[in-house]
Amino acid sequence: MKRKASIMFVHQDKYEEYKQRHDDIWPEMAEALKAHGAHHYSIFLDEETGRLFAYLEIEDEEKWRKMADTEVCQRWWKSMAPLMKTNSDFSPVAIDLKEVFYLD
């Protein structure tokens, strides 16, 4: 498994809605994430800044990249766009983080 982490940004007046949408994640979205090799996916919120810290483990980088091309992912991004900073394709603005320490 490969560990991945990134920072995303949620609008400060949208925290509750962001959390609720993830509490009620579409079953087909959860299935697609798993089918594309996602495990142990967690998102944490810094309420002072609106920064989201996302962590997940993936089986394979290429398999994971294909998730972005799925119809359900495209719909999810579009539905989440009003809540977050996004790119022109509605994908979340995300900063990939470099792992500098790991203790098993």
Swiss-Prot record:
This is L-rhamnose mutarotase. Pfam families: rhaM. Pathway: Carbohydrate metabolism; L-rhamnose metabolism. Substrate binds at Y18, Y41, W76, W77. InterPro entries: Dimeric_a/b-barrel, L-rhamnose_mutarotase, Rham/fucose_mutarotase. The keyword Cytoplasm applies. Homodimer. It is found in: Cytoplasm. Keywords: Carbohydrate metabolism, Cytoplasm, Isomerase, Rhamnose metabolism. The active site is at H22 (proton donor). SUPFAM superfamilies: Dimeric alpha+beta barrel. It comes from Bacillus subtilis (strain 168). It catalyses: alpha-L-rhamnose = beta-L-rhamnose. Belongs to the rhamnose mutarotase family. GO terms for biological process: rhamnose catabolic process. Its main location: cytoplasm. The keyword Ubl conjugation does not apply. One of its GO terms (cellular component) is cytoplasm. Involved in the anomeric conversion of L-rhamnose. Its EC number is 5.1.3.32. It is an enzyme of class 5 (isomerase).
